[in-house]
Amino acid sequence: MSLCLAAGALVATLAVDAFTLAWTHSIEKIRWEEDWRIEAGRLHLVEARIHGSGAGMEPPEGAVLERGVWRYRPLVAPVERLRLANSAYTADYELCFDGRCRPLAEVAGSAENAPMELHAC
């Protein structure tokens, strides 16, 4: 399986079976990270991390604080598509794979702040 990034039409295909989606909270300026795995044509959320805490950003029950980072395993069903509504008023998402993080718009080769969908392909 691979990961497809789409903004209207197919933009990019990445030969990965796991990735991290990261972003900075628009108000609190705190980094969030989600580790995803591609299995059976779906995206599985494996782990999430919050680098601190703030208003409306309380970690869920069962989260563990390690060196200032809250770690937890979200109990959510796998999804076919992950829709990202980018905004001109917030920083771009980052997509991390192969040991490197890059702005999502750079990876996809599209204009920054364009709405995007991630799905297995």
Model regions and ranges:
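N-terminal secretory signal peptides
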Residues: 4, 8-59
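Mature, soluble, non-transmembrane domains
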Residues: 59-121
